[in-house]
Amino acid sequence: MKLTKLLTYLTTEPSVNDSQDPEITSIEMDSREVKKGSLFVCVKGYTVDGHDFAQKAVENGAAAIVAEREVDVNVPVIIVRQSLRALSVLSDAFYGQPTKKLQLIGITGTNGKTSTTHMVDEILKKAGKRTGLIGTMYMKIGDETLPVKNTTPESVTLQKTFKKMNDKHVDTAIMEVSSHALSLGRVHGCDYDIAVFTNLTQDHLDYHKTMDEYRHAKSLLFSQLGGAFNHEHPKRAVLNADDEASAYFEKVTAAHISTYGIKNDADVMAKNISITAQGTSFDLVTNKGTKHITMSLVGQFNVYNVLAAVATCIAAGIPFEIITEAVEELHGVRGRFELVNQQQEFPVIVDYAHTPDSLENVLETCRDMTEGKLFVVVGCGGDRDKTKRPKMAKIAVELADEPIFTSDNPRSEDPRAILRDMEAGVENAYYHSIANREQAIFFAIANAKKGDVVLIAGKGHETYQQIGNETFDFDDAEVAARAIVELNKNKTNS
């Protein structure tokens, strides 16, 4: 695509004449990825500034530069106010506006995004849809699975992925949309058909600073939803009727609204809920029909996830009978209330719960399964929201019998300093503090007995631990399995 053609998608009036109109071969934000004919977009990040690498990009073959300030290079420079938003718009245009050729479903919220995204994907596949998925754990294009770095990838990667979905004849894409991606404008060029809200509780205040700012970031998915009206395929917002933030989102969107919930009246509801260690049953009540549901997933939080998925699929036009059949066949997502089974006498559960609300929810579910003592291994991430550390410790102490504080991903912080922040919220309480996460997991499992439950919280599906500037292999489920094997071996030898 010619540079001048590409720049017509920006609202600015770039001064590029016909003699400066190269053919653009790719769009890049990393100078190391630049090749002959690339358009390099200078983005100022947390640790490096792309403007400092403009000359390097030109040396690597960049045909033009997009920047927020003048840079001294011998190729055309287009000045914009916000490079990241320009990057989103340009990427969308360069790849042929691929989301306009998909039914695009965006799911946002503090907790439940990953599970709900996978549930929607499973239901749509049951209905015969060819799906794509973009989420915390991986990206999927039809049957192909690809790794990811962020919950919501950078806009260039995002639009390139959507273009691949077009090429692979994907008709519906489901994606997790993080608050960071919304506030940074990564999804600015995405044409969503359905936007879904799970819940809003404390998280990411290291970035958003206040809950109002965090809520505003989430609201951008809904305020942008009505931007491209189509009477044949109206935009739809799916909101949690039991979360007070939904009232705010309802005000900012022009889309048709569907609701789901347990406590308050909604379009999709669960009634007569029964939860056991073996699974959950409830009456699914919708304007499309009522059905008694029995599923293997455990916990009220999973009921909410299912309701969100059902409401989403109804909004997507999937028949109610197919939806209910698929719901009863749903299986858990790795690292989300994942049972580790090595023939031990007590349940060991790995869960991604890393916010106060999600930890409280999963501990309450575990308590219902516990005849003896409830153990929880929990830590808090370094270089992240410090205000939730004492809150999570307090929840662990109040809801578990054997709380064990440990490291999560300490990153650049001293693990013991993080533990001290946690301990500040539970002075004079009973708890264990073991900085080494592997040792903490082994300690919990070695001390658990029949009738007890061990919850390992915080990292879920992650297969690494970040300590300082290094990243080490670390998988909670794998470590737990080794601890159980050692426990069983010791019992056999004793």
From Swiss-Prot:
Catalyzed reaction equations: UDP-N-acetyl-alpha-D-muramoyl-L-alanyl-D-glutamate + meso-2,6-diaminopimelate + ATP = UDP-N-acetyl-alpha-D-muramoyl-L-alanyl-gamma-D-glutamyl-meso-2,6-diaminopimelate + ADP + phosphate + H(+)
UniProt KW Cell division keyword: yes
Record-listed UDP-N-acetyl-alpha-D-muramoyl-L-alanyl-D-glutamate binding positions: S31, N150, T151, T152, S178, R186
SUPFAM superfamilies found in the cross-reference section: MurD-like peptide ligases, catalytic domain, MurD-like peptide ligases, peptide-binding domain, MurE/MurF N-terminal domain
Modifications the protein undergoes after translation, according to the UniProt entry: Carboxylation is probably crucial for Mg(2+) binding and, consequently, for the gamma-phosphate positioning of ATP.
Keywords: ATP-binding, Cell cycle, Cell division, Cell shape, Cell wall biogenesis/degradation, Cytoplasm, Ligase, Magnesium, Nucleotide-binding, Peptidoglycan synthesis
Residues involved in ATP binding: G109, T110, N111, G112, K113, T114, S115
EC assignment: 6.3.2.13
N6-carboxylysine sites (modified residues): K218
UniProt cofactor(s): Mg(2+)
Any one GO CC term of the record: cytoplasm
Motif (Meso-diaminopimelate recognition motif): 408-411
Pathway: Cell wall biogenesis; peptidoglycan biosynthesis
Residues involved in meso-2,6-diaminopimelate binding: R384, D408, N409, P410, R411, G458, E462
Pfam families found in the cross-reference section: Mur_ligase (PF01225), Mur_ligase_C (PF02875), Mur_ligase_M (PF08245)
PANTHER family: MUR LIGASE FAMILY MEMBER, UDP-N-ACETYLMURAMOYL-L-ALANYL-D-GLUTAMATE--2,6-DIAMINOPIMELATE LIGASE MURE HOMOLOG, CHLOROPLASTIC
Family: Belongs to the MurCDEF family. MurE subfamily.
Name the UniProt record assigns to this protein: UDP-N-acetylmuramoyl-L-alanyl-D-glutamate--2,6-diaminopimelate ligase
Lineage of producing organism: Bacteria, Bacillati, Bacillota, Bacilli, Bacillales
